[in-house]
């Protein structure tokens, strides 16, 4: 491997150390309802995001709270020597994609049937460490 490739690979590896992922697949909530909660915590610091999710009444907030705690644990596993409070973690990216649909039939008048689409979603959460903040 050349010198430039090795240096670039080391830079990418260092950048990945500051980032932690968590993914929730096939969550049985519609993507529209999940995006409402995801928009509230996007870009927020981890502590504030946890408080927002904890005190929200929506069902999607419980699932997102567990996902955020999992992402924090993933970051701690990557950076065992770093302190969680000093790192100033924030929600760098949160993405809600549509998952598979369960199609069901509901009886309708005059012998017809209406299709019910029970939607699911996939949520990807990326945490970033904000060590060099501009105040």
Swiss-Prot record:
Pfam families: Ribosomal_L22. Gene3D superfamilies: Ribosomal protein L22/L17. GO terms for cellular component: cytosolic large ribosomal subunit. It comes from the Bacteria. SUPFAM superfamilies: Ribosomal protein L22 (SSF54843). GO terms for biological process: translation. One of its GO terms (molecular function) is rRNA binding. Transmembrane segments: none annotated. The keyword Transport does not apply. InterPro entries: Ribosomal_uL22, Ribosomal_uL22_bac/chlpt-type, Ribosomal_uL22_bac/org-type, Ribosomal_uL22_sf. Keywords: Ribonucleoprotein, Ribosomal protein, RNA-binding, rRNA-binding. Belongs to the universal ribosomal protein uL22 family. Part of the 50S ribosomal subunit. This protein binds specifically to 23S rRNA; its binding is stimulated by other ribosomal proteins, e.g. L4, L17, and L20. It is important during the early stages of 50S assembly. It makes multiple contacts with different domains of the 23S rRNA in the assembled 50S subunit and ribosome. The globular domain of the protein is located near the polypeptide exit tunnel on the outside of the subunit, while an extended beta-hairpin is found that lines the wall of the exit tunnel in the center of the 70S ribosome. This is Large ribosomal subunit protein uL22. The gene is rplV.
């Amino acid at each position: 491997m050349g010198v430039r490739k090795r240096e670039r690979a080391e830079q990418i590896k260092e950048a990945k150390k500051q980032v932690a992922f968590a993914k929730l697949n096939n969550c049985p909530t519609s993507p529209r309802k999940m995006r409402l909660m995801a928009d509230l915590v996007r870009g927020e610091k981890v502590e504030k995001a946890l408080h927002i999710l904890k005190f929200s009444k929506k069902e999607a907030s419980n699932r997102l709270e567990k996902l955020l705690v999992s992402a924090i644990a993933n970051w701690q596993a990557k950076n065992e020597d770093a302190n969680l409070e000093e790192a100033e973690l924030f929600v760098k990216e949160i993405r809600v994609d549509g998952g598979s649909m369960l199609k069901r039939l509901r009886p309708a008048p005059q012998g017809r049937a209406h299709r019910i689409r029970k939607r699911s979603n996939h949520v990807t959460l990326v945490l970033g460490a904000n060590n060099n903040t501009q105040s």
